[in-house]
């Protein structure tokens, strides 16, 4: 909600809550839902070099359980600012990394100052806000490599709270 909300009229809890509610009320689901959502359940396999059980083989889980352990959905936010911009939410158990982050992926510019061949292997520009672990912000973008050659490479600028401050911060959801 914080990413999609408009700027509050004042920096108070009530004003922020009001703007968050506005954006949450503007959320639309894909229609039909199956076209923009996926869900699943992890099965046995390998994780970090170790053999792991599937969800149905876990202790206290019925062998015929249909409980999802992964879900992803593409949402819309019907506001002037966000109309036509997809928001993706993904959550799951036993994924390769335990991470909570917000990734804002920018559209490619219609006109780039570099030729297409110089940039075709570049990733998208991104702003990644890491909530946990390793709280911080990363800005990923393409940058020209110094020198006379026309070469552009993906680079990242990182800010880590733990490296910048000695004071301890509360847990992400405290």
Please report, for each region that a protein language model flagged, where it lies by residue.
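Secretory/organelle targeting and membrane-embedding segments
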Residues: 1-173
């Amino acid at each position: 909600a914080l990413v999609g909300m408009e700027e509050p009229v004042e920096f108070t809890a009530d004003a922020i809550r009001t703007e968050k509610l506005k954006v949450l009320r503007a959320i639309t689901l894909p229609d039909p839902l199956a076209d923009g959502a996926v869900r699943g359940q992890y099965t046995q396999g390998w994780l970090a070099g170790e053999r792991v059980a599937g969800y149905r083989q876990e202790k206290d889980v019925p062998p015929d359980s249909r409980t999802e352990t992964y879900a992803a959905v593409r949402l819309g936010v019907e506001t002037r600012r966000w109309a036509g911009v997809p928001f993706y939410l993904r959550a799951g158990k036993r994924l390769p990394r335990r991470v909570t982050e917000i990734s804002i992926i920018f559209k490619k510019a219609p006109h780039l100052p570099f030729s297409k061949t110089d940039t075709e292997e570049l990733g998208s520009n991104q702003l990644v806000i890491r909530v946990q672990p390793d709280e911080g912000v990363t800005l990923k973008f393409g940058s020209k490599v110094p020198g006379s050659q026309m070469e552009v490479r993906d680079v990242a600028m990182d800010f880590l709270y733990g490296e910048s401050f000695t004071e301890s911060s509360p847990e992400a959801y405290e």
